[in-house]
Amino acid sequence: MRILVTNDDGIQSKGIIVLAELLSEEHEVFVVAPDKERSATGHSITIHVPLWMKKVFISERVVAYSTTGTPADCVKLAYNVIMDKRVDLIVSGVNRGPNMGMDILYSGTVSGAMEGAMMNIPSIAISSANYESPDFEGAARFLIDFLKEFDFSLLDPFTMLNINVPAGEIKGWRFTRQSRRRWNDYFEERVSPFGEKYYWMMGEVIEDDDRDDVDYKAVREGYVSITPIHPFLTNETCLKKLREVYD
């Protein structure tokens, strides 16, 4: 397959290098990734300013470029400029830390894959769910095995897979729902060396979803969480109720 690999941790991150090198053992791999950390940039794109791109070296088997853009920019550039619109699969990752619950709305990793889904290209976001001790190789090897088994024709149009891999021994995988996992944010007030006040965002994770088949519960129990998601955000249940009342 011709595989495009991107991420939001940057071209220099271990996660993308390990993933690209392992995938290139069996596939034609192109890497287009941000030239610096772009975590939590969501699905932003670059407009009104130039996008710069530079060829970089990862390995002999991998064609790689860094860009000044976001993960979504990287996918657009790769598809339209570098790969001549011939892409069989897009993989975004391996991310350092989980992308579960409401994280996916902020995640540049997920947005890189979602950009592919919006083009109706098979796309996967993959994260090592332990931020402190990420197992990039374990996540990458899981993905390689998964690709040999999974039938992408089972996915609806414009749908991607969001995969979170637990650290340590993997018991198997589960197809899961996006959870209601979210953050309670607060801001720590600090003072710069120049005496200027600034704020540092902090947060505590809230995991109180009462459903059993959600992403973080699978990961907590040692299973890889695989969640099919799409870019269409309409709340169909609420829409039906509103129409019944007001139409």
UniProtKB/Swiss-Prot annotation:
It is an enzyme of class 3 (hydrolase). Its cofactor is a divalent metal cation. It is found in: Cytoplasm. Keywords: Cytoplasm, Hydrolase, Metal-binding, Nucleotide-binding. Its main location: cytoplasm. Pfam families: SurE. Its EC number is 3.1.3.5. It catalyses: a ribonucleoside 5'-phosphate + H2O = a ribonucleoside + phosphate. GO terms for molecular function: 3'-nucleotidase activity; 5'-nucleotidase activity; exopolyphosphatase activity; metal ion binding; nucleotide binding. Binds 1 divalent metal cation per subunit. GO terms for cellular component: cytoplasm. A divalent metal cation binds at D8, D9, S39, N95. Belongs to the SurE nucleotidase family. Nucleotidase that shows phosphatase activity on nucleoside 5'-monophosphates. This is 5'-nucleotidase SurE. The gene is surE.
